[in-house]
Amino acid sequence: GKYICITNVHTTVMAYEDDNYKNIQNKAALILPDGNPLSSLSRKKGFKEAKRVTGPDLMHEIFKISEEKGYKHYFYGSTEDTLSQLNIKLKERYPKLNIIGMYSPAFKSNVSLENEKKIKEINASNPDFIWIGLGAPKQEIWMSLHEGKLNGVMIGVGAGFDYFADKIKRAPMWMQKYSLEWLYR
């Protein structure tokens, strides 16, 4: 499968300073701007319809569509506690959402390929979407290493799991609108 990166100013600066990370970002099937500075710059560069896309907003939209279409979802990342809460909250909010698996990998200082058993397990569940919640840059590196090995579209959503599990509250809409979400955190 391919992967989608949702990039913000921080990850854009990281890509500017690290050629390997830049190549990982550039290799993505799609890069979405999470932040008004990036979406504004995109519009100035000719992408007239560019809008800010956050991980949680994208998740919500895809979950709604998935309830109608029956798409299957696998969640990889975060902690077991967060995944447990995420499972409960998603079933409450999206009762028809087809969650086919969740896995909390051991926290390691470096990103390495998961063993063949885990890859086969994920692929056997036949996911349409594989949500990756490892945080940047770890999730982008992980997705790049697994491109073509996993079936389904991988989407790195950082703390998206925490928001949907009600572990972290999102900033009020007015703060999001004026690019002040960082201040709320």
Short names for language-model regions:
Residues 1-57:
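N-terminal nucleotide/polyanion-binding subdomain common to many enzyme families
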Residues 87, 140-149:
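Short Gly/Thr/Asp-enriched flexible loops that form oxyanion-binding sites at enzyme active sites
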Residues 104-110, 152-185:
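Short, flexible loop segments at boundaries between secondary-structure elements
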Residues 122-136:
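Proline-aspartate-enriched helix->loop->beta-strand connector
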Residues 9-12, 134-139, 160:
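Short glycine-rich anion-binding loops that position phosphate/pyrophosphate groups of nucleotides
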Residues 38-40, 138, 160-165:
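Short gly/pro/ser/thr-enriched loop/turn and capping motifs at secondary-structure boundaries
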Residues 39-121, 125:
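Conserved beta-alpha
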